[in-house]
């Protein structure tokens, strides 16, 4: 039998350049019509079921080749006779999907060529191509479009590491200056160059937050906390009016930390035996209703500022700690006076970037935020609903008052601020929405918000006990009390996580206490929503010493970052401070990224069940780290004592401040 061939016919007007074909054989020919959309192949008469498709046929172009060599022709061919051999049949077989694939490629190629032709005509001012589907041959030439020069250009720097020289390549001058005084040794840079870059990237992001006036990942020791946070409001229970913090005081960590150990070598969890000297801390004694929890006008405990190269070089400054002896805290039997601050090394500080004018997009965003605030806030005059205003705090972002609610005589904390002076208004909206939507016994009670005469009033319950920070730095907590605090905190976190909210800033500063021992989460400015469509986040926010490794290394993270922070807070309750607080921030970030699970000083003083609780919550791999709900079932939490056991500790702090 003579092999069938393809005979080209008159070009089809289907716009694709595909030609219907006729397979000529001995006997009656069979015509195959290819429709315009090439999605259906319809023979003119019924054809028998084809045998199995031979996938080994050579792939070639559509036409101009024998049928046996082409895979892009029609697959169904009626031979009109049953006498043809199976080998001949296999030679005539093709795959319909190849026709569609070929057609799709032709369509994409044609569309791309038309697009390029149209854009070329547009940019050169010429008319549309007569063959283009985007124009007509009669179109008149268009006027040339003037293209402006780039605006707000940014220089992207690619930093590398040369293992032969042990030096970074392409590193900005600012980063080089910071690295010199960061405390990260040359050997550490060679071992983990990526961790060094991650720490630098976090620093740069923190600087950007500071320049924009937002709440930085490195909370700063300043009089301003532009981000409206629940802690700033409810912290009226632990605020006192003070003068503005001087700019020089912003250069040093505010949380007292012990003398750095002689060796910086890492060790496994609960393995270090370092002993540190301490001094008295009379300056940290609060008044009866005041704690040192940070606000707009009080130096934030735990919160190192975003340091410059000069201030980083002063990291050897000794930090003050309470002088009461405790088996858990790293201290010596004798106390010493703090050493004088060493003169910073002469390092040229990186010049601050020139401030840019606010873009119209930012102005539009502010308008949208203001409209949102008006829709979610009470428009009434709050001065008619609350009385007995007593100013208990002042800062650049607003004033904090204690007051009484008219009718109920309920004691509340109110923060008043001029919304037009807040640089990150969207953070305020975020926090208000979280607080209004989530009510739980372990979350600070949100009462109301007022937007009246361009001023925002946030009303929260009055937490007179202050923050957990004062308790852990001035008292020795038993394992039962630590278990109680962890249990209450985890219950609040579980509620947030079940509702798709990750807190991202769990630490003792953001755990508030009442005089009855109630334990509640606060400060929801860093909260983020995670739903089924977005199960992970990558933004580097939070406070570095409590930050999970996956955040520091800029990986995707989820709810379990809060579990890690809880584990760090548990160490804080044991030792009075989080790990690496005595290190400067850049080195602390490096250690978190490279060491992972931190160590504590006296592991032999902890029970095995507490040790296991710390190990579980501080598991480096987030996939193996338990969730908040799973950690709530840990045996350690069964040792929890009633929260009322914290009342004497809270009251002792207040009475000592009298």
From Swiss-Prot:
Keyword check for Kinase: yes
Show the active-site residues.
Answer: 505 (proton acceptor)
What does the PTM comment state? Autophosphorylated on serine residues.
Q: Which residues form the Protein kinase domain?
A: 386-637
Which Gene3D superfamilies does the annotation name? CRIB domain (3.90.810.10), Phosphorylase Kinase, domain 1 (3.30.200.20), Transferase(Phosphotransferase) domain 1 (1.10.510.10)
Where is the protein localized?
A: Cytoplasm; Cytoplasm, Cytoskeleton, Spindle
One Pfam family, please name it: PBD
Task: State the residue spans of region: Disordered.
Answer: 1-21, 39-104, 126-147, 213-365
Q: Identify the keywords attached in UniProt to this record, alphabetized.
A: ATP-binding, Cytoplasm, Cytoskeleton, Kinase, Nucleotide-binding, Phosphoprotein, Serine/threonine-protein kinase, Transferase
Task: Please give the PROSITE patterns that the UniProt record associates with this protein.
Answer: CRIB, PROTEIN_KINASE_ATP, PROTEIN_KINASE_DOM, PROTEIN_KINASE_ST
User: Which InterPro entries does the entry mention?
Assistant: CRIB_dom, CRIB_dom_sf, Kinase-like_dom_sf, PAK3-like, PAK_BD, Prot_kinase_dom, Protein_kinase_ATP_BS, Ser/Thr_kinase_AS
Annotated Polar residues bias: 66-98, 273-300
What SMART domains does this protein map onto?
PBD, S_TKc
Name positions with the PTM Phosphoserine: 301, 303
Q: Which GO terms describe its molecular function?
A: ATP binding; protein serine kinase activity; protein serine/threonine kinase activity
Q: Which PANTHER family match?
A: SERINE/THREONINE-PROTEIN KINASE SAMKA-RELATED-RELATED, SERINE_THREONINE-PROTEIN KINASE SAMKA-RELATED
Its family? Belongs to the protein kinase superfamily. STE Ser/Thr protein kinase family. STE20 subfamily.
Name the UniProt record assigns to this protein: Serine/threonine-protein kinase shk1/pak1
Species annotation: Schizosaccharomyces pombe (strain 972 / ATCC 24843) (Fission yeast)
